[in-house]
């Protein structure tokens, strides 16, 4: 497999602990893992070995890249079966899980998933809107899985609840190669008010040692 140098050191992938009903979801998880390997990008994810989480982590690990799984201790019996993949970091709760994954990553990608995936996705979008980080956020919109969510967000823009600038935080594409390419080209935007906000959590969430990705100041 030919490797391509990326601006990202590590990408956080949000996805389901289930595999979904369509084979295309499973294929997309594997393709995303392979794309990260091709671009020499490491993975941080929710730490499970089942569902789409298991597929993407196995693809990255088998391709020779580092895998960091962050998982609450309570969920380990449920989401980890058999041999673990890569490095597993146990944390106390869901809040620590999200903060640690965000701190470790240079960008975020959401594969299809359920409530947990949506909650993680929307939180990092909100953090970007508030200027807590400047990291790209991407939706891998497999077979139009996220079409309804994007329609809802566009409706919120039309009704004045989300600004057009905040809408542009979200990058979406139907396949991994196109999505990662768009994330590589992403440039964050901030309005005058957001750019002046100072957050206590900025350094912990936005700074990753050795990263070439711009962080909030």
UniProtKB/Swiss-Prot annotation:
Residues holding substrate: 79, 97-98, 114-120, 126
Signal peptide positions (record): none
Alphabetized UniProt keyword annotations: Cytokinin biosynthesis, Cytoplasm, Hydrolase, Nucleus
UniProt catalytic activity: N(6)-(dimethylallyl)adenosine 5'-phosphate + H2O = N(6)-dimethylallyladenine + D-ribose 5-phosphate; 9-ribosyl-trans-zeatin 5'-phosphate + H2O = trans-zeatin + D-ribose 5-phosphate
GO biological process terms on file: cytokinin biosynthetic process
GO cellular component: cytosol; nucleus
Primary localization: cytoplasm
Entry EC no(s): 3.2.2.n1
InterPro entries: LOG, LOG_fam
Compartments (UniProt record): Cytoplasm; Nucleus
Entry superkingdom: Eukaryota
Keyword Cytoplasm among UniProt keywords: yes
Expressed in which tissues: Expressed in roots and shoots. Detected in the epidermis of the root elongation zone, cotyledon and leaves, in trichomes and pollen.
One of the record's GO molecular function terms: cytokinin riboside 5'-monophosphate phosphoribohydrolase activity
Disruption phenotype: No visible phenotype under normal growth conditions; due to the redundancy with other LOG proteins.
EC category name: hydrolase
pH dependence remark: Optimum pH is 6.5.
Function text: Cytokinin-activating enzyme working in the direct activation pathway. Phosphoribohydrolase that converts inactive cytokinin nucleotides to the biologically active free-base forms.
Family designation: Belongs to the LOG family.
Protein name: Cytokinin riboside 5'-monophosphate phosphoribohydrolase LOG7
Source organism of this protein record: Arabidopsis thaliana
């Amino acid at each position: 497999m030919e490797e391509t140098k990326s601006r990202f050191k590590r990408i956080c992938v949000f996805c389901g602990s289930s595999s979904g009903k369509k084979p295309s979801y499973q294929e997309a998880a594997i393709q995303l893992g392979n794309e990260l390997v091709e671009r020499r990008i490491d993975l941080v994810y929710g730490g499970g070995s089942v569902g789409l989480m298991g597929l993407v982590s196995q693809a990255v690990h088998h391709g020779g890249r580092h895998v960091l799984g962050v998982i609450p201790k309570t969920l380990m019996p449920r989401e980890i079966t058999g041999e673990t993949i890569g490095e597993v970091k146990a944390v106390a709760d869901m809040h620590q899980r999200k903060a640690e994954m965000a701190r470790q990553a240079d960008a975020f990608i959401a594969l299809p998933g359920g409530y947990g995936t949506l909650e993680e996705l929307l939180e990092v979008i909100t953090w970007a809107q508030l200027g807590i980080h400047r990291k790209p956020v991407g939706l891998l919109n497999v077979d139009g899985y996220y079409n309804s969510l994007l329609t809802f967000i566009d409706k919120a823009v039309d009704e004045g609840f989300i600004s057009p600038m905040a809408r542009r935080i979200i990058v979406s594409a139907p396949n991994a190669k196109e999505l990662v390419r768009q994330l590589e080209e992403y440039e964050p935007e901030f309005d005058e008010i957001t750019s002046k906000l100072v957050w206590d959590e900025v350094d912990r969430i936005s700074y990753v040692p050795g990263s070439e990705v711009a962080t909030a100041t």
